[in-house]
Amino acid sequence: MNFIKEIKQDDTDARVKAAKRKKAEASYMPTLQEVFVTGWINPKTGKKKNSIASLKNSDADKAKIKAVYEALNSGELGLEGIPTNKLTKTTVLSVLYPQLVAIRKEEMIHHLIETAPKNYHLVNTESALNHMVTTIEKEPAIAVDTETTGVTHDDVIVGYSISCPIANEHFYVPFRHTTGEQMLPADVCLSVIKPVLEDPKVLKVLHNVKFDHEKFLFDKYSINMVNFVDTMVLMYVLNENEESYALKKLATKYGKHFGFNEKSDTYEELFGKGGFENTPIKVGYIYACKDTHLTWSLYQWQLGHLKKQPKLWHIAFDIEMPLIPVLLKMHYRGFNLDMEYAENYKTELQEQITGMEQQLSEYFPNINLNSNQQLAEYLYGTLKLPNNHDGSVDKDALKELADEYEGVKILLDYRKLTKLLSTYIEPLPQKVWSDGFLHGEINQMGTKTGRLASENPNLQNIPPAARKIFVAPEGKLYMSCDFSKMEIFIACELSGDPNLYDALHSGADVYSVIASKSYGLPIEQCGDGTVYRKHAKTALLGCMYGALPFTIAKQVNVSVEEGKEILDNFFNGNPVLTAQIHKCHELVAKQGYVETLQGRKRRFPEIPAKVKLLNKLDQMIKQKTGKTGTQWDKELDGIYKAKKIPYDLRSKWYSLNKEIQRAYRQSFNATDQGSGGDICKIALINLDKYFSELNKDLPPEKHYHIVSTIHDEQLIEVPEDIPMEVIKQIEYIMCHTIPLHVTMRTDNEFYKRYYHDGKSSEQITSGDLPQA
């Protein structure tokens, strides 16, 4: 009995001790620094608690945790009864951070109202509207912005803001808010601004004009705004490396130079997500007025910089600004999509994919083909196929295995078809507007070099099989007018290389000529189909993109050593072009930028300082080893092999040199590709001028429309009976876009269904039309 009592007593004692321990733990309240930063040890129990900052946190979570910690310390945020020993990462992120956001949002809105400038006006009465109209009448230029329900095509304007710089007054006109506050009717508000926006004598300044232009044009009252400039695009001309071109981001970064010293809060920071229609007008008008106020001020600051740089002024106001109306026309015209063909093709692809899935289940039993690990284990482990890519199952690795195993060949075809179906054939019809056309966008700010980029969808990536869903409207064809070997013509102009000049001027095969010079062989031995021509072509095009020996080797299926030899032969055999490439490197190292033929800059602002630092490291390495890092890198084909150099010094030299060499490789490409981008943009402007005149004397069903630009190709919607003289004029406009020592050439083809049954100019004009 005593034994049993002792056991019970021991059990009771243990429970008492546990209860006391829990009480001790509960009674200790760590400091905020311990909870967030250092972690803490309960002095009574010795138990270690990790800090919230020491946990695995994303960058976004780190910023939120830091904000909460600082707010708690400053008293901006309270714990609201939460004991510090109960503070967890979840509590901080899901409870305290939202509270902090709400507090700061309320403070920002209060500050916005309290500091609202006296020249910011809410226009919600007839007298206020009349005052605005009278003020605008005296202004040769105004800033304009719209506030909308969202950013899609179907979203609508809920109000617009106008800044009048001479009067120094700023207006917001609401008419579709849902907050129940006083507003004027939409027809009244839009009817007074329509003649102003459509007046070619009044300059309109906007930030991201394409968005606002579409909203005005497709509104119920259809306002076609003309004579405008875009401060977002001007900023791109001034600095193609900006992290963000959003107005508030630019104002926060540069505002101190044009009168805005405080941070400019974004819409989401002030009002959260959702459309502007839900924003209280009494607050929203201040935000909206500031938008156009900022836009005008930013524009004046940009003009000051552009006036000091005539070449960039030319890029901005002779190329980029005139291009915007052309791109808008292209966007509004769009592609005619054959919905019936798309649906039938989708069914056909689905049937093919289903059949392939049955085949693949036999070749890859019980394997999840979406699992790279399972696929690799089966191919290289079970089947023992050659493993030349460290277990990779990417496209390149599978291509090498296709001849070894039939299942891999089917798998490659399967992936190709599933991508075609899921990326293009299924989603493209869903993007069609109510007019039955697909309205893609051409982004003039989409690349660092100045080339145009296709978006929503990216027509440049659409494979030929998917392009067949684009069919020209009744009585029309698609004319593809493609600059032939544009990069090479530009490289010839930039360098003055006699080899390129002679080949292009005479019409000889440029790749055979380059091969002959590279290998010191008669041109007869370097014709089409020879390995010399293939290697020279790869090297010529590769040098324009800064290709490394590894890339060259991969493209022609040789070793890296042979790839290096191909490049060496090319550079040695073509010294003038090589000198131009090196000149670009020197310009980047010295001044931090290169220029296109038209004067567009591609900036590498950090490189000159890094080159100086690399030179210092070179001398440090030379003092220790007798050779510079550059010499070691060249001799050993990689400085990492130079064990005589201390690791830290070697590593620093390697990473710095890698960044510099990347900029060097990009520099010649920037001058060549950037010049090509400028030429394509000017060609679009000139073609649009020609078509605008041509269409004046033609019925609408015979009108010419530019519908897209894909790389160096302009795609034009033309009538089926297009005359040869119009074709020749289109060719002339493109080939003579800018004066070059060797006139460029174009390749033309005509399609009813894009990329299907292409016909030449001669066939078209003789009545041999392509089939749908």
Tell me what each language-model feature is.
Residues 290-297, 665-688:
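Conserved pre-motif C helix in the palm subdomain of viral-like polymerases
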Residues 2-48, 56-61, 66-72, 77-179, ...:
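Conserved "right-hand" nucleotidyltransferase catalytic core of DNA-directed polymerases
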